[in-house]
Amino acid sequence: MSLFEALILGIVQGLTEFLPISSTAHLRIIPALAGWNDPGAAFTAIVQMGTLAAVLIYFRSDIVCIVKAVVDGLLKGKPLNTPDATMGWMIAAGTIPIVFFGLLFKDAIETTLRSLYWISAALIGLALILWLTEVRLKQRVAKHLPLKSMEEIGWKEALLIGVAQSIALIPGSSRSGTTITGGLLLNLSREAAARFSFLLSLPSVLAAALLQLYETRHSLLASPSELTNLLVATIAAGVVGYASIAFLITYLKEHSTSVFIIYRIVIGVAILGLIATGAIQP
């Protein structure tokens, strides 16, 4: 991988990680179109450290309050004594499913499921589910039924959104796409679903990145150029990722996810067309 390729893929990671269009799919599609090698699951996981940093910086005040509240609650023997402490435990609970399924299907995630057939199916499939979810949400709003805020997320919501996050292990699904969809199905507002989605990503993204760093440490240390490429891609992903978070949070306050639904379907169909014509290999 050249430095230019690493920079482009880092920018792509930052642009697509937080939008419900799947960063993994784009990191697989763009190299295929450009004639580059597949960067691999390890590259994807490690570069997510950049977008992880973006979440930490953007939500730094929320995260500090949550950590302080959790520690304070444990010291007082009242772990759920404040909304911030409760949110900390909801994030922990929502992380359990992806840890279980991630370890169980690790080999398939890194090999079979990276096929462009799987990716296109996931892009189109989740788009249809998200569309049905938006229809349901609009009907609920039309009936003036209330939507839940972040503070109303309980054990049920946390675990079910965590299960939705596990679906994102299939490349093309989109972590933010599955978790926001899960949140909307559980009657969260779009903004609340997005904010919880981003906070929920912290433990699993950090764990996946650290695991891949550990497993690839020898090859990284043996190749300074590869290490440099990863560093450049990670920094680019972080800078662009921060802007993507700010955009999506603001966008969802006033708009639906329709534009992302259309985009997913167009890209999914385009991939199948390119494979059929032999322009790219699955």
From Swiss-Prot:
Q: What class of enzyme is it?
A: hydrolase
> Principal place where this protein is found?
membrane
Query: What is the recorded membrane topology of this protein?
Result: Multi-pass membrane protein
Known catalytic reactions: di-trans,octa-cis-undecaprenyl diphosphate + H2O = di-trans,octa-cis-undecaprenyl phosphate + phosphate + H(+)
What the entry lists under InterPro entries is as follows: UppP
Compartments, as annotated in UniProt? Cell inner membrane
Q: Which residues cross the membrane?
A: 39-59, 85-105, 115-135, 153-173, 196-216, 230-250, 260-280
Q: What is one Gene Ontology biological process annotated in the Swiss-Prot or TrEMBL record? A: regulation of cell shape
Keywords of this entry: Antibiotic resistance, Cell inner membrane, Cell membrane, Cell shape, Cell wall biogenesis/degradation, Hydrolase, Membrane, Peptidoglycan synthesis, Transmembrane, Transmembrane helix
**Molecular function, one GO term:** undecaprenyl-diphosphatase activity
Q: Which family is annotated? A: Belongs to the UppP family.
A further note on this protein reads: Bacitracin is thought to be involved in the inhibition of peptidoglycan synthesis by sequestering undecaprenyl diphosphate, thereby reducing the pool of lipid carrier available.
Q: What is this protein called?
A: Undecaprenyl-diphosphatase
Record organism: Chlorobium chlorochromatii (strain CaD3)
